[in-house]
Amino acid sequence: MNGILISLEGPDGAGKTTVLKEILPEIQKMKREIVPTREPGGVRVAEEIRQIILDPKNTDIDSKTELMLFAAARRLHMQEKMLPALQAGKVVIVDRFIDSSVAYQGYGRDLGVEVVDWLNYFATDGLKPDLTLYFDVDTDVALERIMKNRADEVNRLDLERAEMHRKVREGYLEIVVKEPERFVKIDASQPLEKVVADTLSVLKKRFVSEF
C-alpha cells in the first residue's frame, strides 16, 4: 500500500470541515489523485449509520452503542473506499478518523482510551494516518461558532453539555502529545484565511515531493 492517508481532527466548531473545502483546490495540484472523504460516512451504509448517530432525536443511544456504531461505520468506510484508494497510490484526506473516537468516546464519554484503541485497531486492522492535522480551539469559542454558524443543523453531539466538549478537547491535547511524529497542531482560533494558509504550509512541507 503506497498511498498517503491524512486525517483532520478537532472538536466540533474548530472549522476543520470548512478548511478542507478551502484547501481542496490547492491540494488537488498534487501529483497523486486526491480522495476527500469523511467519518462517520464516506460510503452508503456508513452514511446511514451517520444519520442514526447524529440524529438529535436518538437520545436513547448510550455511550457504548455510540462507540460501536462509529466503529461499524469506520470499518465499512475503510474497506469500501479508503483501502482501495490507498492501494491505488492515491492521497486520502479524511475529515475525522480513529482519533475522534478516542477523544469523544474515550475521553468525552469516559469509556477509557484502552477500550477505544482496541476497538479502533479491530475495526481498521491497525491502519493509522501518515499525518494528522489537529485543529485546536477554545471550547467556549467552538460552542459559540456552532450556535452561530449552524444553529439550524446542530446534531446530537453538538447538543452535549459544555463539560463533555471540554473533556473532548483535553483528550485531543493529550493524544497530540503522545504521538508528536504524526500530529501537527494548528491554531484554529485564527481567521479562516490564516488557518487555511497554515494548513497548506504544513502539507507542502511534509509532502514537498508530491507537489
UniProtKB/Swiss-Prot annotation:
GO cellular component: a single term: cytosol
EC number of this enzyme: 2.7.4.9
UniProt keyword annotations, A-Z: ATP-binding, Kinase, Nucleotide biosynthesis, Nucleotide-binding, Transferase
Reactions mediated catalytically: dTMP + ATP = dTDP + ADP
Residues annotated as binding ATP: G10, P11, D12, G13, A14, G15, K16, T17
The keyword ATP-binding appears for this protein: yes
GO biological process, one term: dTDP biosynthetic process
GO molecular function, one term: dTMP kinase activity
InterPro entries: P-loop_NTPase, Thymidylate_kin-like_dom, Thymidylate_kin_CS, Thymidylate_kinase
Similarity comment text for this entry: Belongs to the thymidylate kinase family.
Biological role: Phosphorylation of dTMP to form dTDP in both de novo and salvage pathways of dTTP synthesis.
Protein's name in the database: Thymidylate kinase
The gene coding this protein: tmk
